[in-house]
Structure formats: structure tokens, C-alpha cells
């Protein structure tokens, strides 16, 4: 065995798996062919305890047989109850770390009772210094045999593990499978055990949320339990009705009292069987001997020892949960009426208060030791039965009161449902009327003559020049169009007073994206292609030559139709065979899309282009770097409310353009490659030039999906000759299959000015960890040539970015407010709502490949799901047919508006070929031979 293999072998061996038996080999082959299926609770299983749908499986379904493909490990199968308790297993494995120490790092793991803990060394485990803990029973486990990889997806974090030795890899997989089944079986047998892991502890993080239990802001989400049919989404129900159903749903989910009652009754039944046997023996002895009367014996059993009291008290503590906050007192009779204990007596628990029997009877007339022992045993068991019945009665009474309260509240809410529906209808009509009036007002405003006004915006105070201000000219029309946006000079106190949305997170090291930073200095030939663009675009904007009638200020304020209900879509059936694979090649239902595509998403990054305009008027290079950093952060803020849907994948050759006179830029983009998917864009202004080409990789890990962008963003400020480049960070969407999805960005961004070495900026998008609340945090620093920090940045990518030290820090950027009812319209910002708008004037100026003409996307925006699904299938089939034709004829797709170049790092990059706006002038797209994309 090599030294590396020895380094990762367990410190305390359980059993060395040098040779596996035929049975274990067969089991392993069978395990690799099985996958998890979601099982709905049926009437036949009504007596079983409530279980997460991930824990039960039907018959195995074959997966990929290739050794180099990912395989999902099966969970607990239906009817599988006897899972032997596994032995403790420990040893070293390699864990993939993300930033700042990327790569594989050796960690010591301990697997015990379905919980996988890890730290740097065995001594750390003994000292309690645990880096993290994973509940393998509530995780999706997948393996890759050829690479000896093990991945555990806990919904909020993805753990990548690797073992160098094949023997120890097989051992770890076998042990993890055994512990996983054991842990799932424990949850099945005791469902309340799983509830302990819904809310992570502040001191440790030994759990992750169950697959179909979602906790948000301390409240149970609807449709989070398996036996209930999917609830309608909040979009289609009145708020009061939804609240009532959610309370009933919470009561059904919180079945702790009923579970305890069932457990108590089960123990009670077994004890009653023992009592019956003892009673028969007592009657036999009483007939054969002159035994004393049983009722008289009970009257003498009043002396209770303290030891017996403690035993009884301890036993009762076990049967009654600590969480029970309501204790119902049941009256008992002070006297005991003689009853026949071997007959049925429904009022037994209310009539008899059994006392703990003494260890021996003091009646001198009693001579039979056997008879005395039977009497003592009978009284002790009867005492237990009484306690069990009392506990069960209390549980039922508590649940009865809960149900009565829930039903009364729900009935009360139903009484207002009709009134709420009318109010909602009136509100909708008022909103439509308001939108129409706003549109008319904007048109009137655009036709009026408005002089440009100069506004003053505070810039970062430098250490030597505090209090100075830099002025930048902004048109008054922009102020009116963006009246809801907050001024950048507002007090930083608003940042600290703003309400934060904090989500619970499972244990994890503070790690982020593992893909290397893609930072490159673009070669001089790229710069030369863009040097004259600024002067050209400045002249065209000032002279009003950008195109006949395309400049519009009266833009829409709402989408034609709200987003559809996606609660009935079973994502697991779609994604289960694609764990660890690129999802860009997987066709998804159209209901999961939003009516925008990736090319339009690239344009969304220009929403806060004012930051670049301000940078172009800032003489200080450090302050320019801060503004460019704020622009880099602002591109992520629109994703905060967009985790529930995905953009359309552009087809090869698809384009998009956006001209914004109010912001002073013109933008176009094109899908230049399909496999791999590459989107390129170019944006021009009199103050800056922006371009990028991005390759997207989407990977599904069982409960989460990672989006790994590869590419470089470029900004040129012609006034100062600056040329900035930076990379994107990793994006992860959590809770894909259950609960409420939420999005996270993490990784490092390095911004460099390739034309000057005066300073660089490093931004860190902090990954959520379990020891502090750092959701969506961004930290950064601007460093000079000597490595000294000139400016420090902090904030949150969805709330704002600040420069300096609190509370005297200055706000550099803050996003605008969201439109009314944004949650009903895909979470779109005002800028996003305007991107897919198409009017008759613009229609004649666009190329036929523009995304606005895409039929499936347009039908989805209008709320016609059936037509959208049909058109989506047709568009995808057309693309496949074109690809087959090109492959058969050895043809290569050549983009029309971008060209491929090689940058300074010998990497491929896509830049504009300066033909788009020239062809648009005539307009000349009607004269261009364009492919039929839809």
C-alpha cells in the first residue's frame, strides 16, 4: 500500500474489506441499480407512522451501468423494517474544499448511528472540535465508482468526498449505505426523531432539513407532508384561506402527541396481556390456598418507599414528552370500588388510583410467598397500565383542543373568502387602470421638452479628501423613470435598520466554489476593436441617429399574465437520472421557465449601468475601482426572488437587442455555440463599453443545483484608457425538490485594470455557514501596488454595497424597489418586466432571430401554457434537425455578429464584429439570410 493510501486509511479499523463475499457483491450490484422514488401515502399504509417520502422505495429501477457515471444509492424500501444496528466506522477521506483553500484536503471522518462527523484529526473529534456533521439518512447519496467519489447532498450543502484506495472506497460505500438505511429506519419507527433535525442547533449542525419539510421564518410551509394532497399555491387562494389551511397543515404535521399516544397504547396492550396471565395465576392460587381477599390486599398497599416512587417518576418522564406544555388534570375517585379486574371496565383509569406496591407485604396472615410475589407484580404492572392510559388520555385531550381551535379558525376564515375575492378583483382592476394611466403619463412625458438637469451624487471619501463630491450629469427623464430608486448618498443607517431574511443552514465549513478563477488580460487586438466605439456611440446618441423610433420611455409596468402553479410537477422523476450531470441538455417542462431567456439575463446585468457612467467621470483610480466593483455586485441582485424558475435556453443563432435612451446604452447578444452553450453580448455607451461571453454548466446533486459560469466580463472606460476584467462566482439553488427554493452566490471575484497596476479589487461572496448569519454577504477590499488596503467594502448583494467602516460608511449602490405583486410575476424587477416587450414600431426593426419573436416564450408570458409547451417542443425539434443536417454535411455554424479571438492567456473569447448596428440602420435585417429558428 502506498504512503498516500496509508494516509487515508482509518485510524481505528472496523473490518478490512480486502475480499468481498459473493453475497455482498451481489448486494452492491443490486444497490447500484436502485434509485429513490417518491411514494405517496395510501390508505393501506394508514397505520404506519408518517415518514418522509425520500425514505421509502418501490421496486428498484436500473440506472446507468457505466462505471464512470454517477449512481444514486437507494434508500429504505417498502416493508424493510429490520435493519441491524451498524458498527461505528471511522477513518480518513479526502474532502473537496472550496475557497479560499481549493482542492482536496484530508479529513478524519466518524460514522456513528447514521451521523457522519468530520474534523482535521482524530484528536479534534475527541476534543469535540467538529468541523461539520451530516445526517446521511436525510441526504441524497451518489457515487462514482471509477473516480472513487462519494457525494452527499443535504439540500443546503453538497459534500464532495473521495477515497484513494478502492478497498476503502468499497468499505465506506458499504458502511454509508448500512448507516443510511439504519438511520432512515429509525426515522420511520420514530417520526418525531426526524423533527429534532428540522431546526439546526446553534452550537452544532448535526442535521439538515428533511426532504419534504420546509421551514421558513419559523413556520411550516404547505404541502410538506406526504399524506396530504398538494395544496393550491398562494397565488390562486385568498390569503385568509391559505392561512387557515396552513394552520391545519401544521397541526397534521405536528403529530407528536398522537405518536406518543399510539406508543403508550401499544405498551399498555402488552402490559394488559401480562396482567391477564397474572390474574389467572392468582385465581388458581386463591382457589387452592386460603389466600386473602385481593381488594383487602390493595387497601394495605399504601406504604410507598421513596425508591419505588423515584422509579415510577422516572418511567413517567419517559412516557411524557418534555415538549408538552399543556397538562390536563383528570379527576380520580378518592375511594376504590371493588371491581373484577379480569373483566372489561372502560372507566378503570378514572375509578382507580393505583399506588406503588411495597417491596414486601407485612400481613402476618399471608404465608404463601408465590402468591405474594404475584400480587406485587400484578400491582406494579397495573400501575404502569394506569399511567399509560392516563398519558394517552391527556394526549388525546390535547389534540382534541388543537383540532377544535384549528377548525374554528378555518371556518372563520372561510366566512371572509367571498369578501376577499371581491376585494382582490377590485384591486386587480385598480392596478390595471393605474398601469394604463402611468403608461399614458410616460408617453406625454416623453413627448414634452425636458431640459437635462444636473444631480449631485456623493462619492466615496478618500482618506485625504474627505467630504469632496463629484458631479455627474443625469437626465431628468431618468430620475422620473427611476423615481423609486434610492439615492446613493442616503444614510448608511438605513442599511443596518433594513429587515434581513435569514435562512437556517446545515453544518459546513466556510467553503465556496471550487472552479478556478477565470481572469485573463484580453489581447491588444480586442482593445483596438473597441477603441473607437465610444466616440461613435456618443455622436449617434447626441444626434439622435440610433434608430428610427426605437427609443421609448412609455414602457410597460406589468406582465400580461401571472406565473403558473408548479406544485403538481414532480421534479424528482425528471432529475433523478441526471445527478452530477450537466442539466443544460435536459428538457424541462415549460411551467418551470420564466418568460425570459439567457440572452436577456445578460442584459439584466446592465440595469445599474449608471455606476459605470459615474466611474467614467471619476478621476481617482481607487474610486473608479470601487464603482466598477459595485457594478459587478449589482448584476446579482435581480436573482434574489428568481429561484423558483429558470430562463429559456437560447437556440443556436438566437439574438436579442435592447436600446435604452434613458440609460444611454445599446445592447445586443447572440447564442454563438450550442454544445457547449456559449452566450456572448456587447453593450455600448458614450461613457463605457461592456462585453462578455459566458459558458454555463448546470449540475444537479440530488437536492441542490450548482450553476458554474466560465468566462470573463470586460469593461472599458475610454476617457481614462482603463480596461477592467473580472470573473463570475458560483450560483447554487437549494431545496430543488421540496420546500421553498432559495438561491446563493459564493466565491471570489478579482477585478483588475489590465492597463494600469495602480490597484486591484478582491470581492468575496460569503457562503452560508452554521456558526453565524451571513446570508448573501459580500466583503471586499481595494488594494494598492504595495498591498495596502485603500478602501474596504461590505454589504449584501441583494440589499446594497457600502464603503468604509460602519457607522460612517457611505452607500455606493442600492437596488431599486420591487414592483407591486412581484411574487405573482416570476419575481421580476421593473427592468426585467420591460425586456421582452414588443410593440409594432420595434417589430419592424428587429432581426427575425430576436428572442422577442420566440413563440414558446411569448405564450408563457401571456399565460397560455398548453401552446407554450407545444411550441417549446417544436422549437427544440427544429434545433435538433438543424444540428443533424449540419453534422451530416460537415457544416459549422458561424455566428453573424460575433467573432472568435484568442486572448492573452491563449483562451477563446467572443467579441463583436461591428456589423449588428450597421445592418440595422437601413433597416437591413430583412435583406440578411437568417435561419428559421421557430
From Swiss-Prot:
Sequence positions bearing N-acetylserine: 2
Localisation per UniProt entry: Cytoplasm, Cytosol; Endoplasmic reticulum membrane; Nucleus envelope; Cell membrane
Ranges of Low complexity composition bias in the record: 14-29
Nuclease is among the record's keywords: no
Domain PH, residue spans: 86-181
Keyword Iron on entry: no
Biased composition, class Polar residues, residue ranges: 42-53
UniProt GO molecular function: cholesterol binding; sterol transfer activity
Segments for region (Disordered): 1-62
Annotated membrane topology: Peripheral membrane protein
Keywords on record: Acetylation, Cell membrane, Cytoplasm, Endoplasmic reticulum, Endosome, Lipid transport, Lipid-binding, Membrane, Nucleus, Phosphoprotein, Transport
CDD domains (UniProt xref): PH_ORP3_ORP6_ORP7 (cd13287)
Protein name per its UniProtKB record: Oxysterol-binding protein-related protein 6
Organism placement in taxonomy: Eukaryota, Metazoa, Chordata, Craniata, Vertebrata
Encoding gene per record: OSBPL6
